[in-house]
From Swiss-Prot:
InterPro entries: Idi_bact, IsopentenylPP_isomerase_typ1, NUDIX_hydrolase-like_dom_sf, NUDIX_hydrolase_dom. The gene is idi1. The active site is at residues 65, 112. This is Isopentenyl-diphosphate Delta-isomerase 1. One of its GO terms (molecular function) is metal ion binding.
Length: 177
């Protein structure tokens, strides 16, 4: 049976479920999760999406992204997928949500209400090769500059939210100081 995604309205109110590929072909708005893991040096862990992924293959992206299953809370889905994709278990905090829409190169449509989580982990990930073919720790300022120079090397959703991610990290540092 095909994986299902949770269909939502613009307020993130659940309105149904649909097959994942059907939702990406039709452009149905559905719930998603994006995880950003930082180390103690405040570097962000990026993954390079596996060549076998059905969209955005071979592109650099945030640490982990996926969809919650029907009746699964976003926080639980985020912890599950972070373990499955990158072999990392850590505390995650939801930071914000945003909606983005993009027509991808293979004519699939990303139309997601994305819940963004931050976590902290020191050490190397153990990526699932079906999900990620490479990884690296990067400084956020370097990433912002590289996204400006080479946007084609990154997932659309990373570009869509990176400025808000950077602003949240700045707010977090200000609160701690």
């Amino acid at each position: 049976m095909e994986d299902q995604v949770i269909l939502v309205d613009e307020n993130d109110t659940e309105i149904g479920v649909e097959g994942k590929m059907i939702a990406h072909r039709s452009g149905s708005l559905h719930r998603a999760i994006s995880i950003f893991i930082f180390d103690s040096a405040d570097r962000l862990l990026l993954q390079k999406r596996a060549a076998s992924k059905y969209h955005s293959a071979g592109l650099w992206s945030n640490t982990c992204c996926s969809h919650p299953r029907p009746r699964e809370e976003c926080a639980r889905a985020a912890r599950r997928r972070l373990r499955e994709e990158m072999g990392i278990a850590c505390e995650l905090d939801v930071k914000f949500g945003f909606v983005y829409r993009a027509v991808l190169t293979n004519h699939l449509i990303e139309n997601e209400f994305d819940h963004v989580f931050f976590g902290r982990h020191d050490g190397d990930p153990v990526p699932n090769p079906d999900e990620a073919e490479d990884w690296k720790w990067v400084d956020l300022a370097w990433l912002r500059a590289d996204l400006n120079e080479r946007p084609h090397a990154y997932s659309f959703w990373l570009e869509a939210c990176i400025d808000r991610v950077i602003a949240c990290r700045e707010e977090d540092r200000t609160r701690v100081a």
